[in-house]
């Protein structure tokens, strides 16, 4: 059986532009894509922290070091410049790989510059949100799940 697992995310990035008349997609600084392990053309979920909108689209590589995060096409009706968003990529993997896979988590500042890298999807950085009170450390949760199945 294949499982759909979280593989990488860019956390709380700021939307820098929106173009309703573009053909679609989300344009993302190539440095951020690389750090999150997301490829150009890859399916991503865009979760708007500002207004709660959630959509799926594909990525287009933006200029390295630019901090660009542009919402293109019809999604520009839902997500606007200045909104905080989370870009999330998922991948299919078998159970054995899913139990050991280390996702890539990229935390950015208000200008979409990388401030922290990690693999725990529940970790927060100083000045950001807090860790959910009942969240277990990512590696520990995997160990507990493996023990339960054994």
From Swiss-Prot:
In the UniProt record, the gene name given for this protein reads: panD
Give the GO molecular function terms: aspartate 1-decarboxylase activity
Reproduce the UniProt comment on modification after translation.
Answer: Is synthesized initially as an inactive proenzyme, which is activated by self-cleavage at a specific serine bond to produce a beta-subunit with a hydroxyl group at its C-terminus and an alpha-subunit with a pyruvoyl group at its N-terminus.
Q: What keywords are annotated for this sequence in UniProt?
A: Autocatalytic cleavage, Cytoplasm, Decarboxylase, Lyase, Pantothenate biosynthesis, Pyruvate, Schiff base, Zymogen
Q: What organism is the protein native to?
A: Kocuria rhizophila (strain ATCC 9341 / DSM 348 / NBRC 103217 / DC2201)
One annotated GO biological process: alanine biosynthetic process
EC class, as a word, reads lyase
Question: Lineage of the source organism?
Answer: Bacteria, Bacillati, Actinomycetota, Actinomycetes, Micrococcales
Q: Which reaction does it catalyse?
A: L-aspartate + H(+) = beta-alanine + CO2
Give Gene Ontology CC terms. Answer: cytosol
Biological or metabolic pathway of the protein: Cofactor biosynthesis; (R)-pantothenate biosynthesis; beta-alanine from L-aspartate: step 1/1
Q: How is the cofactor bound?
A: Binds 1 pyruvoyl group covalently per subunit.
What the protein does?
A: Catalyzes the pyruvoyl-dependent decarboxylation of aspartate to produce beta-alanine.
Keyword rRNA-binding in the entry? The reply is: no
Subunit composition and interactions: Heterooctamer of four alpha and four beta subunits.
Pyruvic acid (Ser): modified positions: 25
Q: Which PANTHER family match?
A: ASPARTATE 1-DECARBOXYLASE
Query: Which SUPFAM superfamilies does this UniProt record tie to the protein?
Result: ADC-like
Q: Note the Pfam families from the entry.
A: Asp_decarbox (PF02261)
Family named by the database record? Belongs to the PanD family.
Question: What is the protein name stated in its UniProt record?
Answer: Aspartate 1-decarboxylase
Q: Which residues form the active site?
A: 25, 58
* Residues that, per the record, bind substrate: 57, 73-75
Co-factor(s): pyruvate
Organism domain of life: Bacteria
| Primary localization class, coarse | cytoplasm
Q: Where in the cell is it found?
A: Cytoplasm
Q: Where is the signal peptide?
A: none
